[in-house]
């Protein structure tokens, strides 16, 4: 499947900046990946002494394979990059556009457990304006990968800068990491905040303060 122009531009921008998720070119189709994941997941679950003949577990390897390829790791395939609607800013709108409390669910690439939180994104329109729902979809696309929050924040920033043809973009993410909450230190109350600021959001203290203050 040919990639969209938007997907090609965003991927190239991330590669240029060293912000792309570490991944190899895929040599398998989606169905081939599911078959191979299912096979290896059967081995893993068997090694954990689970009885896959039980009707509750029999389909678990296939369910996991489908979930990985079609859902929680679907952002590894740029063929799934959202269809983007960007229009010329003919109205000359030049005030901050903000989308707040975007639901965010990702997966920690170190332990493959959940990252759960929200994102707030703002930009100052220059030449282009993007459909608001597309911002949510871009966040979701990059969240549907094994991730670290710092990279995810930067990836969303660069994607929007590329598509909007402006550096004036800001991204803030607040998330709970289940690799901290459900294992290891088992801290159930802490959360992690990351920001990525570009253009005027980085260079102008007043604009930066306005974004960060309203994002609390």
Curated annotation (Swiss-Prot):
The protein's enzyme class: hydrolase
Record keywords, A-Z: GTP-binding, Hydrolase, Metal-binding, Nucleotide-binding, One-carbon metabolism, Zinc
Pathway connected to this protein: Cofactor biosynthesis; 7,8-dihydroneopterin triphosphate biosynthesis; 7,8-dihydroneopterin triphosphate from GTP: step 1/1
Enzyme Commission code(s) on record: 3.5.4.16
Residue ranges crossing the lipid bilayer per the database entry: none
Catalytic activity: GTP + H2O = 7,8-dihydroneopterin 3'-triphosphate + formate + H(+)
A Gene Ontology molecular function term of the record: GTP cyclohydrolase I activity
GO (cellular component) term, any one: cytoplasm
Keyword match Zinc: yes
GO BP annotations, alphabetical order: one-carbon metabolic process; tetrahydrobiopterin biosynthetic process; tetrahydrofolate biosynthetic process
Record: residues binding Zn(2+): 108, 111, 179
Cystines in this chain: none
Entry similarity comment: Belongs to the GTP cyclohydrolase I family.
Entries under NCBIfam families matching the protein: folE, PRK09347.1-1, PRK09347.1-3
Record note on quaternary structure: Toroid-shaped homodecamer, composed of two pentamers of five dimers.
Name of the protein in question: GTP cyclohydrolase 1
């Amino acid at each position: 499947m040919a990639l969209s122009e938007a997907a090609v531009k965003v991927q190239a921008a991330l590669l240029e900046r060293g912000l792309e998720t570490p991944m190899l070119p895929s040599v398998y189709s989606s169905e081939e990946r599911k078959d191979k994941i299912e096979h290896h997941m059967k081995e893993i679950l068997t090694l954990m002494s689970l009885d896959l003949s039980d009707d509750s577990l029999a389909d678990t390897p296939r369910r996991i394979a489908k979930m990985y390829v079609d859902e929680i790791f679907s952002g590894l395939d740029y063929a799934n990059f959202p269809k983007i609607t960007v229009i010329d800013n003919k109205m000359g709108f030049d005030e901050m556009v903000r989308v707040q409390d975007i639901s965010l669910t990702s997966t920690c690439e170190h332990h493959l457990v959940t990252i759960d939180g929200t994102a707030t994104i703002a930009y100052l329109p220059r030449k282009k304006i993007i459909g608001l729902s597309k911002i949510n979809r871009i966040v979701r696309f990059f969240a549907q990968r094994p991730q670290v929050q710092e990279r995810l924040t930067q990836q969303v920033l660069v994607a929007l800068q590329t598509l909007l043809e402006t550096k004036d973009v800001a991204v803030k993410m607040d998330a709970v990491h289940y690799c901290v909450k459900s294992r290891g230190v088992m801290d159930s109350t802490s959360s992690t905040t990351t920001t990525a600021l570009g253009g005027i959001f980085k260079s102008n203290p007043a604009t930066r303060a306005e974004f960060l203050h309203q994002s609390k």
